[in-house]
Curated annotation (Swiss-Prot):
The gene is SK2. GO terms for biological process: amino acid biosynthetic process; aromatic amino acid family biosynthetic process; chorismate biosynthetic process; shikimate metabolic process. Disruption phenotype: No visible phenotype under normal growth conditions. Belongs to the shikimate kinase family. One of its GO terms (cellular component) is chloroplast. This is Shikimate kinase 2, chloroplastic. InterPro entries: P-loop_NTPase (IPR027417), Shikimate/glucono_kinase (IPR031322), Shikimate_kinase/TSH1 (IPR000623), Shikimate_kinase_CS (IPR023000). Pathway: Metabolic intermediate biosynthesis; chorismate biosynthesis; chorismate from D-erythrose 4-phosphate and phosphoenolpyruvate: step 5/7. It catalyses: shikimate + ATP = 3-phosphoshikimate + ADP + H(+). GO terms for molecular function: ATP binding; metal ion binding; shikimate kinase activity. Catalyzes the specific phosphorylation of the 3-hydroxyl group of shikimic acid using ATP as a cosubstrate. Monomer.
Length: 300
């Protein structure tokens, strides 16, 4: 029976990497002091800035043959970004020591997309809580669970999934539902690993949700009049008021506004998922370095 349970909750992410092209936009207004920049991130920021400048120049260059050298393509900006991502993953992995990571944040903040990238970079397995719940409910979608069984049933299944993941698995990256943070028992399970909060401006989140629709997000279904963006922003603001404080319990905070400032971009929508994943690794490493007298791993 145990083997059957493990099989039912197994979920691989590697075949879904085509979803990376979507740029996550997100959720929050949170007053805090600017994250202290360290030498490592300044190097990353400078490299990514140069990469972005190169990408813009390349797009406007009509002579595409200039990208060829001795019969092969030069390294693309994507390749450079992946090299930086791989390097940051290699740096943080000794600190993790096999511990799992749980991504938390408002709905639509990019937890699944960023989580897949982080898992792939570390060689970890990726799980999506919503997908596990749907599998446990014999393929019933999240929206249908809310409609036919109620939110309380969904929350119970969510807690069951987090419990199984925390007790039965190591070296995994888990994308949680936006409301996972409201139940204290869920934090008990997530704190067995490292929790990472993707902090995204509410306005950016509302724009993204308005663009893709609210069909798969039952908590955004309402009868408010007005345009979709305004309705989404109003509902998200209400949800944030109820959950905002809970997100601060996470081990590490990844602020998309801070990344945007560091890299000199105009908007959080300019960020790529890989850039967000790089910042997540930075914040996780910073947290673990400060964690109760933890020594730096040998060779670092």
């Amino acid at each position: 029976m145990e083997a059957a349970t493990v099989q039912r909750f197994q979920y691989s992410s590697w075949n879904d990497l085509r979803n990376f092209e979507g740029k996550p936009r997100g959720s929050l207004r949170y007053n805090t002091q600017r994250i202290k920049e360290d030498k490592r991130f300044r190097v990353v920021a400078l490299t990514l800035d140069k990469r972005r400048d190169h990408r813009l120049r390349s797009v406007s260059d009509k002579n595409s043959s200039a990208l060829l050298e001795t019969g092969s393509l030069l390294h693309s900006p994507f390749d450079e970004e992946q090299q930086i991502l791989k390097k940051k993953a290699e740096e943080v992995k000794p600190y993790l020591n096999g511990r799992s990571m749980y991504l938390v944040g408002m709905m639509g903040s990019g937890k699944t997309t960023v989580g897949k990238i982080m898992a792939r970079s570390l060689g970890y397995t990726f799980f999506d809580c919503d997908t596990l719940i749907e599998q446990a409910m014999k393929g019933t979608s999240v929206a249908e669970i809310f409609e036919h069984f109620g939110e309380s049933v969904f929350r119970e299944k969510e807690t069951e999934a987090l419990k199984k993941l925390s007790l039965m698995y190591h070296q995994v990256v888990v994308s949680t539902g936006g409301g996972a943070v409201i139940r204290p028992i869920n934090w008990k399970y997530m704190h067995k690993g490292i929790s990472i909060w993707l902090d995204v401006p509410l306005e950016a989140l509302a724009h993204r949700i308005a663009a893709v629709g609210t069909g798969s997000r039952p908590l955004l279904h309402d009868d408010e009049s007005g345009d979709t963006y305004t309705a989404a922003l109003n509902r998200l603001s209400t949800i944030w008021d109820a959950r905002g404080e809970a997100y601060t319990k996470a081990s590490a905070r990844v602020s998309l506004e801070n990344i945007t400032l560091k890299l000199g971009y105009r908007s959080v929508s300019d960020l790529t998922p890989a850039e967000i994943a790089i910042e997540a690794f930075e914040q996780v490493q910073s947290y673990l370095e400060k964690e109760d007298g933890m020594a730096r791993p040998d060779g670092l």
